[in-house]
């Protein structure tokens, strides 16, 4: 996965997409090698892994369960900074306000709680939480699947703008081929835990070679 690009990971439910993503972040134990900027993360001990945690972030599928309802938005977004940075309280608050503006949220709402926001706004909060640490890589695990089409398009546009501005690298997990086509440079197709096809996104979906990929493309056109 090249810096500044997006890799799509598609397949039906249960194909192993999210498991693969969690393994890459070392949130699940796995075998084999996971290389980030040339470093095999599997060889690192827990303490050695800590500097990489801020460089590798995740935005989950469900914005309703991904945010702690007992924490204010400022606490949610700033939590990582308190672990991974040496900033004081004023500097953290400034960083929170800056990233909220970046994702299109009103900074005056930062002391409110997640249940006071819509689904689309909550997903922007989740994106801000990841972005505030200035990561290089973000795992996006079906981040728009629970949103309606209009809000989904807005969030996808935001992700594309942020990628271009900060040269972010995305692994985008989805079952929605339209979303993958809109965002991803290359795509991997998974079935039953195995990669069955991969390639440049446009050519892969225009000329799929594996029967399973052909099936996914047909279903997406219905």
Q: Where are the regions a protein language model picked out?
A:
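Conserved ABC transporter NBD signature motif
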Residues: 32-40
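ABC ATPase NBD coupling module
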Residues: 41-57, 75, 83, 203-208
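Conserved ABC ATPase "signature" region
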Residues: 90-108, 217-218
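Conserved ABC ATPase signature
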Residues: 113-117, 121
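A short, proline-enriched helix->beta-strand linker immediately N-terminal to the Walker B motif
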Residues: 132-136
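ABC ATPase "signature
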Residues: 198-199
